[in-house]
Amino acid sequence: MTATVMKINLARRERQVLEGLADGRTLARVASDLTVKTGTATGYLRHARTKLYGASETEAALAIAYATEAITLPEPLDPEGLDLSAGQRDLVPLIARGMSVTEIGTELKRPLDVIRSDSQQLLRNLDAKNRVHAVTRLWQYRMLTADQVIAWLR
């Protein structure tokens, strides 16, 4: 059973900035594509994160946006053939929460070089351009779900 949360309404530009980042583009590229200054796009992102339960990191804001359907959900992908190690799988919820390598290392009680290596390999396996894009890919592969994200919000 899927838990529900309050519907979040993002302004058009807030949604466009978040969706652009979700595709793996940089904030500067998203701003250019929207023909606004990077500082303006940063402001839109800041407002969106505030609306998305005050998410401090863009990865978490994106996960919350997907869970609350505040932005367009990405098309699902077939997870067959996606081969992630246990170490990489452990990173999934922590990256989606926007935790840093240091925070993840502390949480999992693992050396930082192992966390960095697993993180880089996870992004390669997901064919993700960056950590924000990884959240999209994890959602597409159904390794990150609305129920998981909503559980963090409670």
For each feature predicted by the language model, list its residue ranges.
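Pre-recognition alpha-helix immediately N-terminal to the DNA-recognition helix
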Residues: R15-Q16, R89-D90
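Regulatory hinge/linker segments at domain boundaries
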Residues: T2-R12, I71-G87
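Basic, Lys/Arg-enriched C-terminal extension of HTH/homeodomain DNA-binding domains
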Residues: Y53-P79, R124-R154
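Recognition helix of helix-turn-helix DNA-binding domains
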Residues: T26-A55, S100-H133
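N-terminal flexible/basic segments that precede or flank functional cores
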Residues: M1-T2, E59
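Short helix-to-turn junction characteristic of helix-turn-helix DNA-binding domains
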Residues: L21-R25, V92-M99, L138
